[in-house]
Amino acid sequence: YVKETGVDCLAVAVGTSHGVYKGTPYLDFDLLKTLANEVSIPLVLHGGSGTGDENLTKAVRYGIQKINLNTDLNKAGQSALKEALNTLEKSEGKKLNLQQTIAFGIEGWKEELVHYMKLFGSAGRW
């Protein structure tokens, strides 16, 4: 498939899917290792959110070079936003404007992203 299509990267089906999981998914690391040994292009893991840090770091060790984590990032941003709104409204009794509100969500999103960058060893790299 890789030779026929000339793709730049390959999203592999090794046990993850998009969206929210009930429980932690089972990743087929034997299949992932085989695929990584067979192709010379970067492997992609779709649906990395909810997979767990241990599974994700192992997936990187076994050849995954790009991981989609949108659900985890969005959940972190939403959680930070909700916490900030509850705390500020209770302690100061005031409402925030939209720009202030969005900033809290972005900060939560960034904190989660930094967590993953450190987890995968990509923090501080260019």
Where are these regions (language model features)?
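Flexible, glycine/charged-enriched surface loops at secondary-structure junctions
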Residues: K90-A103, S122-W126
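Short glycine/proline-rich, acidic loop/turn segments that cap or connect secondary-structure elements
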Residues: L73-K94
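Short, ordered loop/turn segments at secondary-structure junctions
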Residues: G15-S17, G48, D72-N74
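A near-ubiquitous, low-amplitude feature marking generic local secondary-structure context
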Residues: H18, P42, I64, E92-Q99
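Alpha/beta enzyme core
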Residues: Y1-E38, D53-Y62, I67-L69, K82-E83, ...
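Glycine- and other small-residue-rich loops at beta-strand/loop junctions that grip anionic moieties
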Residues: Y21-T24, L45-G48, N70, G105
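Generic structural signal for well-ordered, non-membrane alpha-helical segments
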Residues: D28, N74, Q78, L98, ...
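Short beta-strand/loop segments at the ligand-binding rim of alpha/beta enzyme cores
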Residues: N37-H46
